[in-house]
């Protein structure tokens, strides 16, 4: 991983930032969701998504590369065996950041970053649900129109 060149770093130095991201990613994969500051969550998202993409490939070389980034064998094993198969049908977007209220002590903006393990709805399924909803709405409209005609006929 190249040393970050621009902007402020978490923890001050580039090496400390790498360690922070490594630990945050390990906790994210272990627990599924973590609560952290906005800045850390925004830096963690691409870091974690690249690691998950390597885990999806599942080769020995990828496993070794991930072990260089996250030196916790249990977490890496969990990532490759249990989490990666959940993301097979998904092309990116493995994490979600949800804004939380500011931290009480120093008013730092907080976020929850979590893994998105829900199934992706296929485009065909989405189309089918939209079509069913529009068909139902059309039937209701037709039923209302028929009722209005009946009421108008009864009044005459």
From Swiss-Prot:
Pfam families: Ribosomal_L17. The keyword Aminoacyl-tRNA synthetase does not apply. Keywords: Ribonucleoprotein, Ribosomal protein. Part of the 50S ribosomal subunit. Contacts protein L32. Residues 147-156 have a biased composition (Acidic residues). It comes from the Bacteria. HAMAP family: Ribosomal_bL17. This is Large ribosomal subunit protein bL17.
């Amino acid at each position: 991983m190249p040393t970050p060149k621009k902007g402020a770093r978490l923890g001050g130095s580039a090496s400390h930032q790498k360690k922070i991201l490594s630990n945050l990613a390990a906790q994210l994969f272990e627990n599924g969701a973590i609560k952290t500051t906005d800045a850390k969550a925004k830096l963690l998202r691409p870091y974690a998504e690249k690691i998950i993409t390597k885990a999806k490939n599942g080769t020995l070389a990828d496993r070794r590369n991930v072990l260089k980034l996250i030196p916790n064998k249990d977490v890496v094993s969990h990532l490759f065996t249990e989490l990666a198969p959940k993301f097979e049908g998904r092309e990116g977007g493995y994490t979600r950041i949800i804004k939380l209220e500011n931290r009480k002590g120093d008013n730092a903006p907080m976020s929850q970053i979590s893994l998105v393990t829900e199934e992706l709805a296929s485009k065909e399924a989405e189309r089918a649900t939209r079509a069913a909803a529009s068909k139902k709405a059309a039937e209701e409209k037709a039923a209302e129109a028929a009722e209005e005609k009946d009421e108008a006929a009864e009044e005459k």
